[in-house]
A protein has these predicted regions:
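Ser/Thr-centric signal marking residues that sit
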Residues: 62, 95, 123, 127
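Conserved, short, structured surface segments that act as functional micro-motifs
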Residues: 107-149
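Extracytoplasmic/periplasmic cell wall- or extracellular glycan-interacting regions that localize
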Residues: 1-81, 86-88, 96-98, 136-149
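Short histidine-centered loop motifs in beta-beta connectors
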Residues: 75, 90-110, 114
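Short beta-alpha junctions and helix-cap segments that line functional grooves
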Residues: 51-52, 99-100, 121, 130-131
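Residue-level recognition of beta-strand microenvironments
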Residues: 40, 75-76, 103, 120-123
Length: 149
């Protein structure tokens, strides 16, 4: 059975096209880790549950880099995501980095684009090492693929 690629809702399209801390989706940021995408935004995770970010395969211990400068609002364990770092960009954009084996930043810390913030692990819901990467705009998960090269 083949499933159709995920199509954003009208609300998601409006959010993606609005400007905020990360700007419009123009593939302007480097990937947080190099590696193939295991799961894309909107693909089926289990039953009717869909991924709200993307999962990128990378070896355990690979450096996870912030895609843009911002302030860390969470650095620690989050159920389902393992060790997670969430960076706030501007007023309403968040980048999320999960499934890590180690976190190198603290809540409240300012980070720069390209700064190592964590190490890839398998502390989330997968049995193999990978990075969960997501972007949220105004509290709504949006497809992060549009922002990264």
């Amino acid at each position: 059975r083949t499933s159709k690629p995920y199509q954003p809702t009208d609300q998601e399209r409006k959010l993606i096209n609005s400007t905020s801390g990360l700007g419009t989706a123009a593939r302007q940021y480097s990937r947080p880790v190099s590696g193939p995408t295991l799961y894309s935004f909107g693909s089926i995770q289990a039953g009717e549950v869909r991924w709200k970010g993307m999962v990128i395969s990378a070896p355990t211990g690979t450096a996870v880099k912030a895609i843009a400068s911002g302030r860390v609002i969470l650095a620690g364990h989050l159920n389902g995501y393992g060790y997670m770092v969430i960076v706030k960009h501007g007023d309403s954009d968040l980048s999320l980095y999960g499934f890590n084996q180690a976190v190198f930043v603290k809540q409240g810390q300012l980070v720069s684009a390209g700064q190592t913030i964590a190490q890839v692990g398998n502390t989330g819901e997968l049995s193999k090492p990978a990075l969960y990467f997501g972007i949220s705009r105004k509290g709504v998960p949006v497809n992060p693929a549009g922002w990264i090269k």
